[in-house]
């Protein structure tokens, strides 16, 4: 960057008195100082064969001149700043008191204080749900007051519950954490999400609530939405950021609805697996499916080694235009020389199951580093130490330790380019120079023109003055919390590709190491649920491009609701097959019904010919041969799928397998009648029925279309098999007698006395 220093006052370092003496003093202390800019930090250390070698330090006179030049540029920018809201005379409106509520995403705590504001009574913008007002807030720094910061106060048009506003703040601050983590990977462009809080106008009747954000100057653009919309603007960063959050969270959440000015975003939305938090905009896996259908991995995704989400050939071909736009953007995107670590070398840990809570809730359950872990000892670490233990503490010590620091950060206005601030500076670290993937193993750069001896004295005096490290004491504590937060979170990264998941699982089995991630069923299930949602969206015509003739036909006829929608069956079957491989019960059962020619709810018009257009045989039997299994026909393949669904807990599939083993039908050439297995499946169904009687809410979800059998009917079938014997089951009249009596009692409870008498008669015959 070139800064014009002409027409400045003659106070440059070259004309200052006593320059030579100052230069000598500066040279003596230069060895104890570290660099403040990344432009020259790269010249301090080089790495050869994993050995860090110190290069000659740069000229201190040049550094001093550079620092003075930057100070002049900052003063000039401050002096020439023109408030865009001067014409509205907000300073003429009365000062009002407001209670401000701020949320800490790390500590999951709310803090409140009283602030002075001036609110313009007329709204200047209006959306679908909220309207915006101009506001200025008084920022107090010491004894001075500053009203120069511009804010936007957003109020809901319709009356909403008070909790909705606080949920919106929690959502945006959680998304802001993900933006900070994204910046740590040194993408081509850093991003930031606007700080937001809630203010309550306590001096106004009714104490209305507003969302408060900094005013962003520039052109407001919506890059993507929570329903799969992607802007035509050739921007790679917003889409890569959404993809990044999905993989980094272990498939548990995704930040979408990216909008704002440049790379300063506001009003995002978060999709989670459970789909019940973060408001009505959280579409769960359905929203994730809509995003991946319109998303194509770009250069940033590839550089960060994010996995390509599986799409069918027709889906890929349908987005050639989007790929061309991305190619044009590639030419204009200047990527810094950053080397990212490959996924195969990154270590991630097992992702928590969805029943234990979403990613952010799990990660907050951690311990803050104690005082001894962050203490710098002059005896063991000198000023030039670049060990992993020293670097984070040095960076934290370089930050101010003001109690009002959070307020100061929020009070300074931001512009489109303000994303590269303190968080961005802390993120300038090489995270890709180690094969282990742990950030602590990488070598960040020290930053700041700071004498470390004085730093330690300042740090020790501050620590002694506050006694202990409280949660609100200093920036160091907050940064330590963030480091611990992301240290745990990075271990949950999971690829968004079933093939990558399978390879990761194979690697874990081969390594047999605790540090190698074990792929859980939950990770497969989330990915599979996204694919099953895509298959359902295809069937509903969500991605159908309706031509004018078809549109007129749909709008002009009353019976068109019964006309089947012509959708992309190939893509729907493609996603159904991947969902089946991921172990989604609905996908497994739907595939089984299609193969066996049974009615099914999902993809009703798909037949076995659509599922296997080239015929069933060689490919499927080749896979079975690789697993050491015998070749099968189509009927046995369907029976295998049905048995898998039964093992997964579907009662209809259990009844099907029990009946199949009882009669020997629809089992294929490699299976025969087996009374023992039939009774085993019948017993499982009875067990499920007993659980449902104890608790009606704990019944297993079934996707089968089989007519359920009553308890007394199942018991009677089991009794008949024990009475007859054979097919792997020993004849047992005593057991048959007991089962017939149980069936009779169950029939009496079902108010079927005639059938109960029949069962009692059969029981007496077994007793004779």
UniProtKB/Swiss-Prot annotation:
Domain Alpha-type protein kinase: 102-309
Chain segments carrying region Disordered: 1-21, 402-446
EC annotation from Swiss-Prot or TrEMBL: 2.7.11.20
A biological process term (GO) from this entry: myosin II filament disassembly
Bias (Polar residues): 1-17
Residues the entry annotates as binding ATP: 279-284
SMART domains named in the record: Alpha_kinase
Biased composition (Acidic residues): 402-411
EC supergroup of this enzyme: transferase
Inhibition and activation profile: Calcium(2+)/calmodulin dependent activity. Undergoes calcium/calmodulin-dependent intramolecular autophosphorylation, and this results in it becoming partially calcium/calmodulin-independent.
Catalytic activity: [translation elongation factor 2] + ATP = [translation elongation factor 2]-phosphate + ADP + H(+)
GO MF: ATP binding; calcium ion binding; calmodulin binding; elongation factor-2 kinase activity
UniProt keywords, alphabetically: ATP-binding, Calcium, Calmodulin-binding, Kinase, Nucleotide-binding, Phosphoprotein, Serine/threonine-protein kinase, Transferase
Quaternary data: Monomer or homodimer. Interacts with cmd-1 in the presence of Ca(2+).
Function: Phosphorylates elongation factor-2 (eEF-2) at two threonine residues that are conserved in all eukaryotes and are located within a GTP-binding domain. Calcium(2+)/calmodulin dependent activity. Inactivates eEF-2 by catalyzing its phosphorylation. eEF-2 catalyzes the movement of the ribosome along mRNA during translation in eukaryotic cells.
Family the entry assigns: Belongs to the protein kinase superfamily. Alpha-type protein kinase family.
Descriptive protein name: Eukaryotic elongation factor 2 kinase
Native organism: Caenorhabditis elegans
Source taxonomy: Eukaryota, Metazoa, Ecdysozoa, Nematoda, Chromadorea
């Amino acid at each position: 960057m070139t800064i014009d220093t002409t027409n400045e006052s003659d106070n440059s370092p070259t004309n200052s008195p006593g320059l030579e003496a100052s230069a000598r003093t500066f040279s003596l202390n230069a060895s104890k100082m570290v660099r403040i800019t990344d432009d020259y930090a790269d010249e301090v250390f080089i790495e050869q064969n994993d050995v860090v070698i110190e290069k000659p330090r740069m000229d201190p006179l040049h550094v001093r001149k550079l620092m003075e030049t930057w100070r002049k540029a900052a003063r000039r920018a401050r002096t020439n700043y023109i408030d865009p809201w001067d014409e509205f005379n907000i300073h003429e409106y009365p000062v009002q008191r407001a209670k401000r509520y701020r949320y800490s995403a790390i500590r999951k705590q709310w803090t409140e204080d009283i602030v002075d504001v001036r609110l313009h009574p007329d709204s200047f913008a209006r959306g679908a749900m909220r309207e915006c007002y101009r506001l200025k807030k008084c920022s107090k720094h010491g004894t001075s007051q500053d009203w120069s910061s511009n804010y936007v106060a957003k109020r809901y048009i319709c009356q909403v519950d008070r909790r909705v506003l606080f949920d919106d703040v929690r959502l945006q601050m959680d998304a802001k954490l993900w933006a900070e983590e994204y910046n740590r990977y040194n993408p081509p462009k850093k991003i930031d999400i606007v700080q937001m809080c809630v203010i309550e106008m306590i001096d106004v009747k009714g104490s209305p609530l507003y969302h408060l954000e900094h005013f962003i100057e520039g052109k407001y653009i919506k890059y993507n939405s929570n329903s799969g919309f992607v802007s035509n603007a050739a921007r790679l960063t917003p889409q890569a950021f959404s993809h990044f959050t999905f993989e980094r969270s272990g498939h548990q959440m995704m930040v979408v609805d990216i909008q704002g000015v440049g790379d300063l975003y506001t009003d995002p939305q978060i999709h989670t697996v459970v789909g019940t938090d973060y408001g009505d905009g959280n579409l769960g896996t359905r929203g994730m499916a809509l995003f991946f259908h319109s998303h194509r991995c770009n250069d940033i995704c590839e550089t960060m080694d994010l996995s390509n989400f599986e799409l069918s050939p027709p889906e890929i071909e349908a987005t050639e235009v989007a790929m061309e736009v991305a190619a044009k953007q590639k030419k204009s995107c200047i990527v810094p020389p950053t080397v990212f670590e490959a996924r195969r070398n990154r270590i991630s840990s097992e992702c928590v199951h969805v029943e234990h809570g979403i990613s952010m809730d799990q990660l907050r359950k951690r311990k803050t580093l104690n005082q001894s872990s962050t203490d710098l000892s002059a005896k063991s670490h000198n000023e030039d130490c670049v060990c992993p233990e020293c670097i984070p503490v040095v960076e934290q010590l370089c930050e101010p330790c003001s109690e009002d620091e959070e307020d100061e950060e929020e009070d300074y206005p931001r512009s489109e380019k303000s994303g590269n601030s303190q968080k961005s500076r802390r993120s300038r670290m090489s995270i890709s120079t180690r094969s282990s993937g742990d950030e602590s193993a990488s070598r960040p750069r020290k930053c700041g023109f700071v004498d470390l001896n004085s730093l330690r004295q300042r740090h020790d005096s501050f620590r002694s003055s506050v006694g202990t490290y409280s949660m609100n004491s200093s920036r160091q504590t907050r940064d330590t919390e963030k480091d611990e937060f992301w240290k745990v979170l990075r271990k949950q990264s999971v690829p968004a590709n079933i093939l990558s998941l399978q390879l990761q699982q194979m690697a874990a089995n081969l390594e047999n190491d605790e540090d190698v991630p074990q792929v859980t069923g939950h990770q497969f299930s989330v990915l599979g649920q996204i694919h099953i949602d895509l298959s359902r969206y295809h069937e509903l015509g969500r991605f159908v491009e309706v031509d004018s003739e078809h549109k007129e036909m749909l709008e002009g006829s009353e019976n068109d609701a019964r006309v089947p929608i012509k959708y992309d069956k190939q893509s729907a079957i493609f996603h159904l097959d991947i969902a089946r491989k991921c172990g989604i019960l609905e996908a497994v059962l739907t595939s089984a019904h299609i193969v066996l020619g049974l009615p099914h709810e999902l993809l009703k018009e798909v037949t076995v010919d659509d599922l296997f257009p080239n015929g069933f045989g060689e490919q499927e039997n080749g896979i079975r041969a690789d697993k050491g299994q015998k070749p099968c026909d189509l009927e046995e393949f369907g029976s295998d799928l049905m048995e898998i669904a039964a093992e997964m807990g579907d009662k209809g599939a259990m009844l099907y397998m029990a009946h199949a083993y009882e009669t020997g039908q629809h089992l294929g050439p490699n299976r025969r009648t087996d009374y023992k297995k039939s009774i085993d499946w019948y017993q499982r169904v009875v067990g499920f029925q007993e659980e449902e009687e104890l608790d009606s809410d704990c019944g297993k979800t079934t996707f089968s279309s089989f007519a359920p059998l009553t308890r007394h009917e199942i018991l009677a079938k089991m009794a008949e098999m024990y009475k007859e014997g054979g097919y792997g089951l020993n004849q047992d009249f005593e057991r048959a007698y007991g089962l017939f009596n149980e069936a009779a009692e169950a029939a009496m409870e079902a108010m079927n006395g005639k059938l109960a008498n029949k069962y009692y008669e059969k029981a007496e015959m077994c007793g004779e």
